[in-house]
């Protein structure tokens, strides 16, 4: 195991060369090279520039080789139906004309009239689409019959690329089935059908199934690329490769969502009934001789075209956001052929709306919502048809491919169909391609083993059916009236809170074990109780759990790391030697999510912290070790800021103190000050690094005296222009942080806040929606300080599901901010200034019974996250599908 393979995945708008390998840890997948693709007008037809594409493929191979990956095999997949013809010398006779070219107009209708729809469907099982290869060949026969006479080889686009690499001509089975020329029962070319349509049988190559090794690179190609690769035919139809990586068992309807949306189920035998034909379902080939019973739906092509035509630079995420805010309600039939290649997609959509008597969408948000709602309606109809035709109910819809990232569609589809929608992996096509190559080389025994790997290697997101949007919206509208009667701008409150990032602490996910090779016992007064199953065991699992938690939390996110989460490839690295390279996986992950990273030196749980002293230690060697560790952490934080485009808050907290009354309080504090001065000697751009210091009043092992007390760090921060961090669990039980914030804000431009929940002497319980949390949020909102505060969480609880702990705590922080934003602060201040304390108290109490829950549900709904009654079901599903499997794996290892 462990050899890299290359999967070339080309779609209608772009192509990628992906590298992947199978290992004991799962599947390592990385993008090596990306390039654009677009049909171009050539010789009067819309064509794919296959020469350009093959040049890009070769560039990608070279990049992989030059990066030291040492790939051993390669396989190509593309879209379906399009082809080239070769002459007897292997030279191309035709361009690869696109399926969107109008040359086939009217051809399909003529075939149906002369041959009969039922007869053709019973033989091929393929849906009637005007761009099918059969109709392209018949158009070519009519327009350029001499080309068919000269043709010695028919190769579909990925077959052609394989030929250019090896000199070997083959037709791959899954893609060949889309031609409407393969017999669905024999799974071979239908020679009788070819003769009846007057197509030369000799140009069609023997069908090869996915996993066939067709040869190595030609000598000239090997020399040009500087590598020897074995070419293994995957499922060359991109959808077939994507379905091969479907992580769920056969209990789901799948949607392979990209430029096209292909919705269906996987069968062992075809369904060629009258009902299937009437609904225009197709029976395409799959990996392992399976049948992909599916329906072609327009997919994201329409939104891609709208995005291309809109003035300005609209991203797909911006369009999705605009759609979520739109009130447009019209739906059109996205499966009409008029949307295949219109001159102007926006005008075509608007005209379709006019013809149906619908309001005409004008704004980007209305256009996007019209497309999304229409797609969802088409999906819903297809699911209903699948259940009726197959005679089986399906409880889940699994979306794979790039469209799985569209939370707006995913949630609305779950609501409309009343089925759980599972989204991911997004790179299913490349993964399926690689799995087939691995099976061919004996790394995996069969596709089921590969799918099991996918289940553990790639995170998925669950979207459960929510209460009907009209129900949530109607309750919200009713509640909104009550709040507006108090003079509150509800929409402004939503917008304000949505922009506040909350930094989620990674250490909740693994009970502060970290990922260091050198195992260290917890120290510094830190302890984690509980043993709930499913603890993350490595960085990949921790990131996967974090992604699941973040998918349940509305608003902006950040993630807070400790230095003990370095990933050093099994090489022991001391903390004072940590480098940016040890956090590259975290940065790559954060980039993929568009979030920032905050950072903390880990100045505990180490032999050099065993006696409870670190930066204040009397031993200079130990102090120097920790100084160098903190310096390394600031450098790593600067790397985070540079790579992610947002400052990284790097926070220093040390456990230094004494259990009993010390005989010298001053000297340890002098040493701590000198250590901090040494750490901060190097200047960093505040656009990259925000230096923060955190105090504590007492702790286990420092009950009598803490070196870095509140007074110490407050004065140090003031004198040295550092941010002061208030931790809600680091003060005496009679003190509350909400009472300190206004005093601090008078003298500090920025503050940092760690939100926890103290319980007696323990400071780090899961945050609940209690009075103090609400008061903290109220202080920040009414003093207009949300832009001056950096909010993070800091708790750890191993007695409950760790993802649930993240969700509960962070949702409560966001909930408290929204609660505060929906208060009439100006009026309450006025009552106080006027001395009308009776009215002030009455209003404060009255607000506690306002329908805030309806506001919160609407806020969550708009951002595509589960409401208060729904998120726990998602966590329980994740626990069953992912976290509990870790326990069984640990048991096997024992």
Curated annotation (Swiss-Prot):
Binding positions for Mn(2+) per the UniProt entry: 730, 762, 764
Catalytic activity: L-rhamnulose + ATP = L-rhamnulose 1-phosphate + ADP + H(+); L-rhamnopyranose = L-rhamnulose
Highest taxon above the source species: Bacteria
Pfam families given in the database record: FGGY_C, FGGY_N, RhaA
Single GO MF annotation: L-rhamnose isomerase activity
Annotated segments matching region L-rhamnose isomerase: 466-894
SUPFAM superfamilies: Actin-like ATPase domain, Xylose isomerase-like
Cofactor: Mn(2+)
Recorded metabolic or biological pathway in which this protein acts: Carbohydrate degradation; L-rhamnose degradation; glycerone phosphate from L-rhamnose: step 1/3; Carbohydrate degradation; L-rhamnose degradation; glycerone phosphate from L-rhamnose: step 2/3
Keywords carried by this UniProt record: ATP-binding, Cytoplasm, Isomerase, Kinase, Manganese, Metal-binding, Multifunctional enzyme, Nucleotide-binding, Rhamnose metabolism, Transferase
The enzyme's E.C. designation: 2.7.1.5, 5.3.1.14
Protein name, as recorded: Bifunctional enzyme RhaA/RhaB
Organism lineage: Bacteria, Bacillati, Bacillota, Bacilli, Bacillales
């Amino acid at each position: 195991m462990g050899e890299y393979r290359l999967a070339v995945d080309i779609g209608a708008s772009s192509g990628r060369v992906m590298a992947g390998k199978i290992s004991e840890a799962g599947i390592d997948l990385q993008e090596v090279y990306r390039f654009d693709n677009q049909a171009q007008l050539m010789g009067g037809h819309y064509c794919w520039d296959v020469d350009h594409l093959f040049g890009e493929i070769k560039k990608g191979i070279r990049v992989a080789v030059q990066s030291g990956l040492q790939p051993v095999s390669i396989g190509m997949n593309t879209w379906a139906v399009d082809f080239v013809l070769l002459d007897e010398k292997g030279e191309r006779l035709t361009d690869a004309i696109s399926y969107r070219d109008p040359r086939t107009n009217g051809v399909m209708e003529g075939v149906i009239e002369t041959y009969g729809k039922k007869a053709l469907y019973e033989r091929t099982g393929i849906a009637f689409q005007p761009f099918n290869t059969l109709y392209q060949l018949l158009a070519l026969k009519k327009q350029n019959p001499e080309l068919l006479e000269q043709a010695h080889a028919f190769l579909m686009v990925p077959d052609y690329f394989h030929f250019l690499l090896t000199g070997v001509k083959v037709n791959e089975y899954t893609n060949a089935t889309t031609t409407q020329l393969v017999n669905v029962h024999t799974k071979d070319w239908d020679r009788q059908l070819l003769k009846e349509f007057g197509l030369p049988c000799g140009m069609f190559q023997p069908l090869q199934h996915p996993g066939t090794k067709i040869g190595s690179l030609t000598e000239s190609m090997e020399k040009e690329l500087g590598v020897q690769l074995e070419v293994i035919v995957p499922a060359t139809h991109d959808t077939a490769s994507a379905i091969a990586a479907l992580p769920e068992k056969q209990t789901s309807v799948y949607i392979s969502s990209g430029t096209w949306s292909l919705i269906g189920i996987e069968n062992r035998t075809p369904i060629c009934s009258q009902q299937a034909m009437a609904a225009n379902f197709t029976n395409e080939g799959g990996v392992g001789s399976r049948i992909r019973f599916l329906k072609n739906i327009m997919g994201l092509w329409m939104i891609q075209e709208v995005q291309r035509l809109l003035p300005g630079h609209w991203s797909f995420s911006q369009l999705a956001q605009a759609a979520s805010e739109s009130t447009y309600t019209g739906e059109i039939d996205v499966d009409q052929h008029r949307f295949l290649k219109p001159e102007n997609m926006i005008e075509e959509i608007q005209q379709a709306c006019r013809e149906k008597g619908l309001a005409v969408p004008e704004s980007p948000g209305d256009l996007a919502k019209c497309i999304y709602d229409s797609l969802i309606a088409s999906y819903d109809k297809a699911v209903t048809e699948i259940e009726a035709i197959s005679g089986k109910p399906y409880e889940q819809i699994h979306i794979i491919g790039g469209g799985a990232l569209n939370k707006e569609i995913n949630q609305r589809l779950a609501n409309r169909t009343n089925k759980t929608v599972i989204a991911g992996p997004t790179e299913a096509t490349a993964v399926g391609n690689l799995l087939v190559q691995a099976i061919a080389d004996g790394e995996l025994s069969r596709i089921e083993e590969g799918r099991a790997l996918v289940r553990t290697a790639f995170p998925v997101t669950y979207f459960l059916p929510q209460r009907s949007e009209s129900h949530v919206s109607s309750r919200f509208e009713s509640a909104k009236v009550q709040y507006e009667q108090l003079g509150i701008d509800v929409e402004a409150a939503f917008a304000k809170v949505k922009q506040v990032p909350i930094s989620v602490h990674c250490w909740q996910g693994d009970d502060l074990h970290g990922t260091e090779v050198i195992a260290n016992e917890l120290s510094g007064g830190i302890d984690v109780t509980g043993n709930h199953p499913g603890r993350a065991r490595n960085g990949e699992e921790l990131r996967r759990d974090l992604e699941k938690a973040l998918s349940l939390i509305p608003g902006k996110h950040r993630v807070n790391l400790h230095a003990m989460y370095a990933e050093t490839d099994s090489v022991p690295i001391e903390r004072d030697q940590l480098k940016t390279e040890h956090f590259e996986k975290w940065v790559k992950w954060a980039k993929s999510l568009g979030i920032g990273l905050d950072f903390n030196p880990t100045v505990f749980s180490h032999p050099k912290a065993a006696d409870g002293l670190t930066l204040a230690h009397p031993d200079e060697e130990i102090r120097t070790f920790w100084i160098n560790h903190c310096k390394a952490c600031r450098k790593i934080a600067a790397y985070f800021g540079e790579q992610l485009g947002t400052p990284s808050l790097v926070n220093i907290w040390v456990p230094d103190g004494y259990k009993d009354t010390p005989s010298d309080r001053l000297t340890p504090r002098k040493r701590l000050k000198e250590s901090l001065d040494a750490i901060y000697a190097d200047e960093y751009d505040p656009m990259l690094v925000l230096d923060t210091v955190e105090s504590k009043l007492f702790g286990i092992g420092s009950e009598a005296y803490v070196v870095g007390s509140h007074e110490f760090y407050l004065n140090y921060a003031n004198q040295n222009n550092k941010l002061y961090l208030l931790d809600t669990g680091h003060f005496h039980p009679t003190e509350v942080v909400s009472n300190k914030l206004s005093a601090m804000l008078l003298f500090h431009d920025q503050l940092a806040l760690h939100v926890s929940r103290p319980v007696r002497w323990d400071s780090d319980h899961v945050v609940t929606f209690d009075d103090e949390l609400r008061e903290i949020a109220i202080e920040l909102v009414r003093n207009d300080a949300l832009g001056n505060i950096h909010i993070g969480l800091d708790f750890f609880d191993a007695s409950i599901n760790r993802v649930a702990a993240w969700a509960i705590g962070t949702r409560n922080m966001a909930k408290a901010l929204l609660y505060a934003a929906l208060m009439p602060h100006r009026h309450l201040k006025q009552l106080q200034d006027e001395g009308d304390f009776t009215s002030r108290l009455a209003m404060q109490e009255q607000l506690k019974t306002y329908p805030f829950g309806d506001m919160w549900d609407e806020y969550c709904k708009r951002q595509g996250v589960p409401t208060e009654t729904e998120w726990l079901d998602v966590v329980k599903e994740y626990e069953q599908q992912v976290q509990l499997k870790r326990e069984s794996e640990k048991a096997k290892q024992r």
